[in-house]
Amino acid sequence: MVQRLKTVYEQEVIKQLMTRFQYKNIHEVPKLKKITVNRGLGEAAQNAKILEASVKEITEITGQKAIVTRAKKAIAGFKLRQDMPIGVMVTLRGDYMYAFLDRLINLSLPRIRDFRGITAKSFDGRGNYNLGLKEQLIFPEVDYDGIEQIRGMDISIVTTAKTDQEGLALLKSLGMPFAES
């Protein structure tokens, strides 16, 4: 099944960006590379149930099985040993990526309380965008009664854009609701 956002990109966004930035070749046009959804769980080392619940939750939200991230080295101050589970992560590419971004833009972000758009200042200087969410309840896939604790997550949108202006133009033309600054 072809994703709606991918079709929009191929039919409209490429033409818009080629005229705006005067690209000579279609391969110069920035495109989405991957989306990474990450959740750090400091308390997962003590409680395995939290880890399982987070894996299940992130898997439901993204549509792809999440993996458990582990500590690379021991840190005594955090009571952390090497290879202890400390988070959950999933990397989305292809159709899963477009489907997730479509749901994020059109269903989840508008459900945030007092939502006036996301900030355009979260670009990293190379055209990639980072977004932090405070709660998982904005996603329609999450059952309100099935969660014990409200936890946030980090979403990284990696593009092939070389500058922040190109990345912003790409995400804006895909429908990302940026706040007017």
Curated annotation (Swiss-Prot):
The keyword rRNA-binding applies. PROSITE patterns: RIBOSOMAL_L5. One of its GO terms (biological process) is translation. One of its GO terms (cellular component) is cyanelle. Its main location: plastid. It is found in: Plastid, Cyanelle. Transmembrane segments: none annotated. GO terms for molecular function: rRNA binding; structural constituent of ribosome. Keywords: Cyanelle, Plastid, Ribonucleoprotein, Ribosomal protein, RNA-binding, rRNA-binding. Disulfide bonds: none annotated. Binds 5S rRNA, forms part of the central protuberance of the 50S subunit. Part of the 50S ribosomal subunit; contacts the 5S rRNA. Belongs to the universal ribosomal protein uL5 family. This is Large ribosomal subunit protein uL5c. The lineage of its organism: Eukaryota, Glaucocystophyceae, Cyanophoraceae, Cyanophora.
